[in-house]
Curated annotation (Swiss-Prot):
Transmembrane segments: none annotated. This is Potassium channel toxin Ts16. The lineage of its organism: Eukaryota, Metazoa, Ecdysozoa, Arthropoda, Chelicerata. Belongs to the short scorpion toxin superfamily. Potassium channel inhibitor family. Alpha-KTx 20 subfamily. Residues 1-16 form the signal peptide. Blocks potassium channels. Has the structural arrangement of two alpha-helices stabilized by disulfide bonds (CSalpha/alpha 3(S-S)).
Length: 58
């Protein structure tokens, strides 16, 4: 019983989390995140303008 509930929770997170995250990406990323992602890139301005957040699964 417990394992099926656990699997259901994991599945719902895997399905709902990306949808929720896409909505947050539309609103824009944290500047610190984009600065970290674009550091050392040749086209830093382009990178910052087109920066997208990538969800990290813990």
């Amino acid at each position: 019983m417990h394992s099926s509930v656990f699997i259901l929770i994991l599945f719902s997170l895997a399905v709902i989390n990306p949808i929720f995250f896409d909505m947050k990406v539309e609103a824009g990323c944290m500047k610190e995140y984009c600065a970290g992602q674009c550091r050392g890139k040749v086209s830093q301005d382009y990178c910052l303008k087109h920066c997208k957040c990538i969800p990290r699964f813990i």
